[in-house]
Amino acid sequence: MKKLFAIIGMLMLVAFSIQAQKTYALLAGVSNYGDPNINLSNTTKDVKRLNTIFKSQEFVTAMITSQNANHDNIVKKLQAIVRLAKPDDKIIFFFSGHGSPGGFVPSDRSFFNYQELVDILKKAKAKNVFCFIDACMSGSVKTISANNFGIGNNYPRICFMTSSDANELSRESSLVGNGFFTKALIKGLKGMSDKNTDKSITLGELYNYIYKDVVHRTSGSQNEMHPQLLCPDSMKGIVLTKF
């Protein structure tokens, strides 16, 4: 009987541990840069649609858009999440807006360097951090030393999935209602990327689906896009969503 109670107790502890794990997501999108010549159409939609998906997964989400998505606000929100997240939690950062070599552009038109982003995220106790960047030239994050992304048993392990390569523009489309990358990201998270049909979406499955979808939709156009994945191989099997 004691052995039975011990087994039940262990199962309850495991169940509680699984339930206690959280995913914190900060979603930032800039449509309005204060200039009609550079304003974007779908970035706020990108954020809102992703937020709906993440909330359905019971993620703890924070959403900042347009003028609120300035450099200082993004930093403050990220730092708050970094302080909250525990080792078994996950952190997700998503940005949709303009980009340039080495970083992305918040609403105040300042420059948010990818190295600065990594420096903030490296302070997290959470073991796994995921960044999804839908911005021009976002693949330029590859210029950051691989030592910044977690090697071997070093934590946190940081993943970047970007909409385009370092020398490519990222596009949005009124026909799909989102950026090409974010549209594929949304479809993938909702189940289209579940190659082995186990009702779970891993990072590797998600990237493979996004890459094929985006390349297919932009192939032959003036601005082809080739999404990039930069992360330790050990992260590719991590489950991001279930459906």
Go through the PLM ranges and name each one.
Residues 16-243:
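Cysteine endopeptidase catalytic domains of the caspase/legumain-like
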Residues 4-14:
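Sec-dependent N-terminal signal peptides
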